[in-house]
Each structure stands twice: as structure tokens, then as C-alpha cells.
Amino acid sequence: MMPEDEVTFRLAQLLLLLDAVAGQDAKGASLERIGYYDFLSANPFLVVDSDGREGNMLRLAGFDPQVLSYASSSQRFTSRRERIQHDLGLLVAYGCCEVHNRNGAFAYSINDRGRELGARFTATYAASFTTAASIVVRRLRKLSDKALREQTARWLRPDGEGGPGAALLSVLGPEPQAPDMPWEG
């Protein structure tokens, strides 16, 4: 069983994400945008160059750019996104976040109770995820919804630059080349 299969884990992760969103936009974010932020914060090397300053920060926080789970990113993105609405509904019901009408769409934001609860998380992963979420939200918040969808689709393509296929190739190496020997019959 994966941690993201546990409701408690997902709710805690969403609280940390909503807190990172509040640091960039106090009005919150849409369901769709939260879905992108959530997935990409858990897989930050799809967004961040592993050789840059932010890549170093992520490595220090415990993320590894060569983790093989990046190879199945698109499948995990789809299943995680389907759970987000349910999980946000639970956070609203528990009084940890609020939903508002923002330009005709729902926007979710953390409230004081959710912030207080999130501040009590002591797991190393909570600190790591908070670092990743802050970086990802800061990088992506200025993209329009359409640009965010398009960019994420490029990151999730197996053959995309810096995508899961590139991460897998960096671990496995290039495909074997045929020797320069003529076949004898």
C-alpha cells in the first residue's frame, strides 16, 4: 500500500499544500489548480531542474530526481486528481479549509484551524513536502490555467525533456546500440 492510498496522509498533505498556496495567494486556488499543485509538489523534479539551486534544496529535503516512480507519473496523476475533490470536501467538513466563489468558480483556501493543525505535523516528510510545495506553487502560480494544463502535459509525456522517460533513462542509461559488425549468413 502506498501512503497516498491512506486518507489521513492525503488530507495532511493537502493541508500543507493549501498553506503553501496561502503564502502565494490568500484567495486560494481552484480544484483543478490544486490537483496540479498537489501532484507536482509530490513529484517536484518533474518541474524543477535537478542541477539548479531549487534542485539542491529538494535533494536536501529528501527528494531524489532518479526515483523510478517518476516513470509512472501520468497514471498516478490521473488517479490522484480523481481523489482531490473528495479530500477537499473532507477538509471543508472538518473545518480545516474554506471554499469561496472566485470569479464564478470554487476556490479552496486553508483557514486558521487548518493552519494550526498543519503546524503540528512533525514528520520529516511534512517538512520535505512543504519545501517542495512552496517551490512548485511559486513557480506555477503565474501560469494561466490553460498554460498550466499544457505544461503539465509536456512534463508527463514519457519522451518529454525532463519528463519521466528522461528520469528513467538517467537511471538505466541509453538503449543498447547494435555493434558495427555485418551479419554473416
Predicted regions: what they are:
Residues 123-185:
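Exposed, interaction-prone assembly regions rather than primary DNA-binding/catalytic cores
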Residues 78-79:
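Winged helix-turn-helix DNA-binding recognition segment
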Residues 69-75, 95-105:
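Short acidic, glycine/Ser/Thr-rich loop/turn "cap" segments at secondary-structure junctions
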Residues 1-72:
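Short, amphipathic alpha-helical interface elements at domain boundaries
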Residues 98-134:
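Accessory beta->alpha helical hairpin/"wing" motif in late/C-terminal subdomains of nucleic-acid enzymes
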Residues 14, 83-95:
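Basic amphipathic alpha-helical segments that dock to polyanions
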